[in-house]
Amino acid sequence: GPIGQYQKLSHGYFSFPKLEGEIGPRMMFRGREVLNWSLNNYLGLANHPEVRKADAEAAAKFGMAAPMGARMMSGQTKWHEQLERELAAFVGKPDAFLLNYGYQGMVSIIDCLLTRRDVVVYDSEAHACIIDGLRLHTGKRFVYPHNDMAACRKQLEHATKVAQETGGGILVITEGVFGMKGDLGKLDEIVAMKKDFNFRLLVDDAHGFGTMGKGGRGTASHFGVTDGVDVLFNTFAKSMA
């Protein structure tokens, strides 16, 4: 929203700048060229000639609305299944599942993995989609200060006691690359705690997929702990735009 002297004049409303021109690091705003710091097109693939060519060919072959409908009705295709297999192989996991978009994906994953008996331990700077997903969770949850591994261990001790009482499991949630600060989650240290605690690890790697690790395989690959991460959440919206 507006800052400085303009904040008082905004009456609480956000502004919506109108950018013009091709998506890129430099675009036109109010008749002059400006640097665009707001794009998610990390690798510039949205402008790549091969990507544009494939996009045009797919639109000509299948139309602009295909596949139309939810996957459980009329929206499932062999291309979905092929892409899921290729993505799973790329990041080193046995399987993958495509969802419509990132925010909904994380909320759905959390809701799918947890029951009211389960306990969650999560980083205080987890993305808003994680927080919204946790709001649907009716069980206990414990937060630890950002990247504070001593505090994370303490919360795992609390979570273990609660899980023993409820008969549930423990899910730890963190990010590979934190979107607000740009620092890395301490995945190697969290995975190491599995020697002392019984939990599953869900990593939101929206910003790390395509940019971190061997060949862009993500932050878990960067730390060499892919096998220790139980569920990887990635998105096409950042590096694959």
What are these regions (language model features)?
Residues 129-137:
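Active-site-proximal loop->helix
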